[in-house]
Structures are given as C-alpha cells and as structure tokens.
C-alpha cells in the first residue's frame, strides 16, 4: 500500500477516480472515532462522498494488527447487502484494491449515531425490531447460496479483529473464565452458516430525525456463525443498561423487539437458542472490559459492574439475558 488517505489526498483521489467530474472545489474532513480505518468525508458542488482506508495497525492502546485487504471484503458485503436490503447500507461508488480505499455515498449530515443517542438518553426502542428484521433478512438470504459462501470464505479478518483481541485476550486476562469463553470461541470457529456482519451494533448505525436508519462498517464480514451478530448487538445494549440503569426498561423493550424482528425474517433457530445467545453476549461484554478494545462509554464503576454481570451470565446462561436485572 503506497497511498495514504488524509484530508489532503482525499480530493485528489476523487478526481483520479472520476468522482469530481466538474472539478468543483472540495472540502475534506476526517471523521473521528475510527479505530480500524481512516475515514474522510468529502463535499462540494455535486460531490458528497465518504472515503475509507483500512489500517494495518489499529488505533488502540494495545498492539493490534490486521490485514488491510479486508476493505475488499467490505466492498463485496456492501454490494451484496445493498441488493438484499436496498437503502440500508451506503452505496459503493468506487474502489481501489491496490491501496485498499473505498468510496461510498455520504449519509445525511443530520443522521445521528444510534449508540451516541442512547448515551444521551434517547433509546429509540422501536428501532430494535427494524435492526432485528434487517439482520434476519441478511442471515436468511445468505444461508443457502454457495456463491456467497465461496466469496466470503475468509476467516482471517474475523480472527484478527474479533477472536484474537476479544475472546483470546479475555481468556488470558480472566483465566477463571477461560473455559467458558474458549467454548464460545470454538463454536464461532466451527459453524459456518451464513454471511455474518461481525460489527452489527448501534455504534455502526445512523438514525435520521425522520426515523430512517442505516448500517455501516462491514469489514469483518465472513461466512460464519450467526449467533455472533446477535450477541454483538445485544452486548452493546446490555452494556448500556449497566452504564445507564434508568434506561434499562427501554433497552429491554429494544431487545425484545430486536429478537422478535430477527425471528420474523430469519426463521426459527438459525442463530441457536436463548442459552447460546446469552453465553455469547456475555463473552462480548467481557471483551469490552478486558479485551483489546474496551468500550469508551463505560466509566470505572460501570466497567466493574459489567464484569460481574457478564461473569454471572456466562456461568448460568440458561437464566437468560436479564437475569441480573
């Protein structure tokens, strides 16, 4: 990779790839919060584009490396899921495989990050069913198509970006939980049923004031175990419930809608039973306290509380997601 995406190089890249045909003056702004990629918004007359380049070393305190060619996987996933659920993911406008850069449509400026809204007290529980229906549509729509399985039959990004920094790190730092966490990790490695997003959570969803919503960040997409996507989403909701207890009932309604929506579009049992979903959710909660990428919205008190809640869920997953509440 010889090209480095930044606010100076982004407008040049657009011109070289035919995305500024009128040669309009452009404004490039780096969007914050990106751990795994450099993300630049570029706007001007007739131009509204988001550029993304995957990083080989992620922006966290611990050393965390991953192959930047996962950008090519994201492009393929955006195109496929854009066909399954039109208007839900950004449209791909251009792509440079050599330098691992993708250009996609810039979503509306008024759209807000859903996780940020939850942190401000606006839960939007009605969106839970929408999120579940979309995920179920993706899983069901990719579970019986051999061409999709062949295209996304790469597991290295999931190992580098999820199993190693999450499960394996938790096992080292919480040895008393290693057996249970390790069992979940092996389930994720051994089951290959459908296209798994790998990053499906409110932090990767935008919501407009009129209720329209979008999903972004698909660089971890792979053929795998669908329970991961449910658990990943649910882990953020339960983390939020621990962090902001006054929102817990609304968040519980959100979860109920999410699970109902997923069941309605995916079919029965695709992602396993409630016990399995709870165990995997607990693992991913621990990943956000003791893994390589801790959740920034947890304060010290909430982090300690999450450790206790997640350990309890992992010990008795048959009691359900809300047994602690």
Regions from the language model: what does each represent?
Residues 28-51, 183-228:
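Active-site acidic catalytic loop and adjacent metal/ATP-binding pocket
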Residues 1-28:
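Juxta-kinase regulatory segment immediately upstream of eukaryotic protein kinase catalytic domains
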Residues 58-59, 111, 205, 223-225, ...:
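Conserved protein kinase catalytic core
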Residues 31, 36, 40-147:
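ATP-binding pocket architecture of kinase catalytic cores
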Residues 166, 268-325:
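Helical subdomain adjoining the active site within ATP-dependent kinase catalytic cores
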Residues 76, 227-267, 281-301:
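Active-site activation/catalytic loop segments of kinase-like enzymes and analogous catalytic loops
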Residues 1-8, 105, 137-187:
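Active-site catalytic-loop/activation-segment of kinase and kinase-like phosphoryl-transfer enzymes
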Residues 19-26, 74, 178-190:
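Short Pro/Gly-enriched beta-strand edge/turn motifs at strand-loop
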């Amino acid at each position: 990779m010889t090209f480095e995406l930044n606010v100076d190089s982004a407008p040049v890249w657009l011109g070289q790839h035919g995305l500024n045909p009128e040669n309009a003056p452009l404004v490039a702004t780096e969007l914050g919060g990106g751990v795994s990629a450099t993300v630049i918004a570029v706007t001007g007359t007739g131009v509204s584009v988001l550029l993304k380049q995957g990083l080989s070393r992620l922006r966290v305190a611990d050393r965390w490396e991953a192959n930047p060619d996962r950008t090519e996987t994201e492009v393929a996933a955006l195109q496929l899921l854009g066909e399954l659920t039109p208007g839900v993911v950004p449209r791909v406008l251009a792509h440079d495989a050599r330098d691992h850069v993708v250009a996609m449509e810039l979503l509306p400026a008024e759209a807000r990050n859903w996780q940020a809204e939850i942190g401000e007290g606006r839960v939007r529980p009605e969106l839970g069913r929408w999120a579940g229906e979309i995920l179920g549509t993706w899983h069901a729509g990719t579970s019986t198509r051999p061409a999709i399985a062949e295209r996304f039959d790469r597991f290295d990004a999931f190992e580098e970006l999820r199993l190693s920094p999450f499960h394996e790190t938790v096992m080292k730092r919480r040895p008393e939980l290693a057996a249970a966490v390790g069992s979940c990790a092996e389930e994720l490695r051994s089951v290959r049923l459908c296209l798994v997003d790998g990053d499906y959570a409110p932090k990767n969803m935008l919501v407009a004031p009129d209720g329209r919503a979008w999903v972004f960040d698909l660089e971890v997409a792979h053929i795998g175990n669908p329970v991961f996507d449910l658990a990943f989403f649910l882990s953020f909701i339960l983390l939020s419930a621990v962090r902001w207890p006054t929102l817990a009932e609304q968040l519980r309604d959100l979860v109920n809608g999410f699970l109902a929506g997923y069941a309605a579009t995916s079919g029965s049992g695709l992602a396993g039973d409630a016990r399995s979903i709870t165990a995997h959710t607990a693992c991913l909660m621990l990943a956000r306290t003791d893994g390589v990428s801790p959740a920034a919205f947890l304060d010290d008190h909430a982090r300690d509380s999450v450790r206790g809640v997640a350990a309890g869920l992992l010990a008795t997953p048959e009691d359900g997601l809300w047994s602690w509440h």
